[in-house]
């Protein structure tokens, strides 16, 4: 008996551990700054007014388009979702069996224990009903900015960017991560691009500390609202 209780306790601990969200950690290698693959050679000073390596096209701008360049992404995300679901199942069954004879004969239906004669008639009726309703609403708003680096430039000119920002506060840390693809034409003259122009965007806003813990339900509450709850 004690062994069975230990098995159930261990299984419950494993299930409850799966309900705990992982804590984000800084210095993720995937979001680390990407440096240029080939550093530019140092130009020799020949004493002339014109120095090779410092030239700039008259009609070009300072937009980021090389690996390792810096781009600022302005976050302006708003999402809302609502879902309603309802189900109702009802079933009624009834069966009546009436017999006056059995194999061509009428059996003796006298009750030897008293209280009236017995009967060959039988009946069954049953009702079953199940009803469920659910409703879920969610809304999120994320505004701000984050500066990332160019990780890769594809042959068609699409720029892959990614980066993260950690803010250390009195009661914990806040994390903003973003990764995605942008077009060079969407980069403004001040080297910024809105997050709504980022394709295949992966935006993460999370944190650690007392504020992050206060916004999360307890482990037992997460179990009751999880698919593991049988009712």
UniProtKB/Swiss-Prot annotation:
Keywords: Bacterial flagellum, Cell outer membrane, Lipoprotein, Membrane, Palmitate, Signal. PROSITE patterns: PROKAR_LIPOPROTEIN. GO terms for biological process: bacterial-type flagellum-dependent cell motility. A lipid is attached at residue 19 (N-palmitoyl cysteine). Pfam families: FlgH (PF02107). It is a lipid-anchor. Residues 1-18 form the signal peptide. It comes from the Bacteria. PANTHER family: FLAGELLAR L-RING PROTEIN (PTHR34933:SF1). HAMAP family: FlgH. Assembles around the rod to form the L-ring and probably protects the motor/basal body from shearing forces during rotation. This is Flagellar L-ring protein. It comes from Pseudomonas putida (strain ATCC 700007 / DSM 6899 / JCM 31910 / BCRC 17059 / LMG 24140 / F1). The gene is flgH.
């Amino acid at each position: 008996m004690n062994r069975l209780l230990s098995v159930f306790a261990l299984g419950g601990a494993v299930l409850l551990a799966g309900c705990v969200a992982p804590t984000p950690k800084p210095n993720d290698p995937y979001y680390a700054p990407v440096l240029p693959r080939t550093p530019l050679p140092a130009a020799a000073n020949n004493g002339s007014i014109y120095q090779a390596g410092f030239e700039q096209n008259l009609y070009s701008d300072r937009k980021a388009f090389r690996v390792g360049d810096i781009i600022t992404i302005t976050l302006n995300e708003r999402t809302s979702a609502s879902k309603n679901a309802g189900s109702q199942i009802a079933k009624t069954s009834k069966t009546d069996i009436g017999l006056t004879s059995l194999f061509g004969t009428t059996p003796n239906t006298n009750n030897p224990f008293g209280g009236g004669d017995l009967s060959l008639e039988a009946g069954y009726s049953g009702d079953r009903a199940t009803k469920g309703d659910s409703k879920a609403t969610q809304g999120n708003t994320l505004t701000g900015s984050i500066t990332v680096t160019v990780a890769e430039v594809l042959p068609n000119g699409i720029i892959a960017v990614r980066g993260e920002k950690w803010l250390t506060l009195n009661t914990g840390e806040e994390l903003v991560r973003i990764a995605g693809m942008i077009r060079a034409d969407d980069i403004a003259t001040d080297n910024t691009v809105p997050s709504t122009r980022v394709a295949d965007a992966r935006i993460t806003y999370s944190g650690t500390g007392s504020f992050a813990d206060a916004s999360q339900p307890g482990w037992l509450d997460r179990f009751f609202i999880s698919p593991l709850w049988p009712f």
